[in-house]
Amino acid sequence: MKYPPSLVSLIRELSRLPGIGPKSAQRLAFHLFEQPREDIERLAGALLAAKRDLHTCPVCFNITDAERCDVCSDPSRDQNLICVVEEPGDVIAIERSGEYRGLYHVLHGVLSPMNGVGPEKLHIKPLLPRVQEGQEIILATGTTVEGDATALYLQRLLEPLGAVVSRIAYGLPVGGALEYADEVTLGRALTGRQRVSK
């Protein structure tokens, strides 16, 4: 049996979303079909409103619905700290920690030559004028090969500008047992250890 063309189209469009394969798209399509029309209209309205109202902050490239994002607009933020992250979701994760009071710069990806992503496809160039001598730039890219390569590339660009470049620490999660840690995570936890007594 073949699916009706409108269902095929819906499955195809849903499968274009990140992390959604054909089977997940099919399940979502059937789920949406079962929902009341009002729920579907509300979802469609939310999608259209988000596309209409949201844009990137012209300073840090985080997502906002205002002229500048909340962080860039907040004068109480530490202007001597810029945390460079891969995606807008990373900003939310760091903000949730409650431990960071500086600014951000969102790259919208990582260097990935295999996928055709070079420096020109990321928001790297607009970061450079924001950097001042003595300012600390925290590189908070992921621990993937691409994340590490992006951090190294940025370090080489930023250090000649007089910036103090640091990388976020990696290691064991809170409550994690050593026996369950992989070798790379455990190695980084040991290398990035902190002194606790003088």
UniProtKB/Swiss-Prot annotation:
Residues 80-173 form the Toprim domain. The keyword Cytoplasm does not apply. The keyword Secreted does not apply. InterPro entries: DNA_Rcmb_RecR, Hlx-hairpin-Hlx_DNA-bd_motif, Rcmb_RecR, Rcmb_RecR_Znf, TOPRIM_dom, TOPRIM_RecR. GO terms for molecular function: DNA binding; zinc ion binding. Keywords: DNA damage, DNA recombination, DNA repair, Metal-binding, Zinc, Zinc-finger. A zinc finger (C4-type) spans 57-72. SUPFAM superfamilies: Recombination protein RecR (SSF111304). It comes from the Bacteria. One of its GO terms (biological process) is DNA recombination. Belongs to the RecR family. May play a role in DNA repair. It seems to be involved in an RecBC-independent recombinational process of DNA repair. It may act with RecF and RecO. HAMAP family: RecR (MF_00017). This is Recombination protein RecR. It comes from Deinococcus deserti (strain DSM 17065 / CIP 109153 / LMG 22923 / VCD115).
